[in-house]
Curated annotation (Swiss-Prot):
SUPFAM superfamilies for the chain: YehU-like
Pfam families reported for this sequence: UPF0270 (PF06794)
Name this protein carries in UniProt: UPF0270 protein YheU
Assigned protein family: Belongs to the UPF0270 family.
InterPro entries reported in the protein's UniProt record: UPF0270, YehU-like_sf
Amino acid sequence: MLIPWQELSPETLENLIESFVLREGTDYGEHERTLEQKVADVKRQLQCGEAVLVWSELHETVNIMPRSQFRE
């Protein structure tokens, strides 16, 4: 089930994004990016619709995923 990110408090959204970024592991790109940069990137992806917040009833967890990978 999709969760409208706009309906979350800014603090809750920030915490969800930080948790997601920290779970994603180490970035082995050419340039190391700060946590703040990664959080800003995910927030931008949510705002422009590239990513969505998804509630899993089975696992009772929230995840962030590319919109193209979400299947209802």
